[in-house]
Curated annotation (Swiss-Prot):
Homodimer, and heterodimer with other family members. InterPro entries: 14-3-3, 14-3-3_CS, 14-3-3_dom_sf, 14-3-3_domain. SMART domains: 14_3_3 (SM00101). Disulfide bonds: none annotated. This is 14-3-3 protein gamma-1. GO terms for cellular component: cytoplasm. The gene is ywhag1. It comes from Danio rerio.
Amino acid sequence: MVDREQLVQKARLAEQAERYDDMAAAMKSVTELNEALSNEERNLLSVAYKNVVGARRSSWRVISSIEQKTSADGNEKKIEMVRAYREKIEKELETVCQDVLNLLDNFLIKNCGETQHESKVFYLKMKGDYYRYLAEVATGEKRAAVVESSEKSYSEAHEISKEHMQPTHPIRLGLALNYSVFYYEIQNAPEQACHLAKTAFDDAIAELDTLNEDSYKDSTLIMQLLRDNLTLWTSDQQDDEGGEGNN
């Protein structure tokens, strides 16, 4: 029998050593024990996979950029090598995302009780995130399917968070942040992205007195990120409008 506490301890240790693959493997084993995760365990799982997938997302972006430049050069051999390498990274990224999505569907979301709104929103947000990461590298029909799954997960989480969580709750705010990024980057819908981010920010500002001392830092950091995105996106839209006016 695997000792749950030992696995969690191993995950903490791996995090300190920045060995995120080991950390993810340990937390995957904890999740597969099929018992509800504590808040700390939930965060360990999230941090582990965020770093594992983050490394692949970063590599994919670098190689995609090189691929575009190489295509312009017209060196066939090099183009083929770069493409093959991008596809290798893509497969790794897809495997990681699928791992997380399986854990969410088979254990985490399934085991949320009727009143565990915070956990449910956390896991549905995570589901939206990992389908979004798949959408970043997918094309054609495959992309359409993962985009739809991402939207569905974010939307369900959003409804639950609005009904059961304070506007200043860091999980509700984090969901709004990522959902708005989904609209902006994946759906290419800047108006929806700005509306969602602005509403979340304004609602939180209006209820600043409900800020929990424990999560004050987290909440205010996410509010700052929402505001930064809004500033960037609205200036981008103005630039686009200006550009169109000049054509």
